[in-house]
Amino acid sequence: MLSPKRTRFRKQHRGRLKGISTRGNRICFGRFGLQALEPSWITSRQIEAGRRAITRYARRGGKLWIRIFPDKPITMRPAETRMGSGKGSPEYWVAVVKPGRILYEMSGVSETIARAAMRIAAFKMPIKTQFIKTPVLATIQ
């Protein structure tokens, strides 16, 4: 699963999910993509589950790019612990995703295979997503 090798600080504030994604909202590497339509935290486990679903369906055909990285630590307190005595220890990592963000990109496969693979990965995500593709430029005659 994805997580940073090292961070400057162990713990972070929760923050807010305001607005739409201004970066990472266009297809850069592949021909097909899965785009987020809602704001959410996506855990490293969910990212990995989506990656496995896509690669399993495509049978190692084509290439896959993961466009999000979980760089935010989420802390948790032990069960049945009294209030106070500081913030809990980091338990897992999440990627902060705003609407419009590209989650996965794919190329080297047909559109039907890419659409089906992305649909399976979309079921693993906690948010609504949409399948997008880059417009193919007409050949110059």
From Swiss-Prot:
Pfam families cross-referenced by the UniProt entry: Ribosomal_L16
Recorded GO MF terms: rRNA binding; structural constituent of ribosome
Gene Ontology cellular component terms for the protein in this record: chloroplast; mitochondrial large ribosomal subunit
Any GO BP annotation: mitochondrial translation
Leader sequence segment: none
Compartment(s) where it occurs, according to its Swiss-Prot or TrEMBL record: Plastid, Chloroplast
Keywords on record: Chloroplast, Plastid, Ribonucleoprotein, Ribosomal protein
The protein's assembly and partners: Part of the 50S ribosomal subunit.
Entry's family note: Belongs to the universal ribosomal protein uL16 family.
PANTHER family: 50S/60S RIBOSOMAL PROTEIN L16, LARGE RIBOSOMAL SUBUNIT PROTEIN UL16M
Name of the protein described by the UniProt record: Large ribosomal subunit protein uL16c
Organism from which the protein derives: Zygnema circumcarinatum
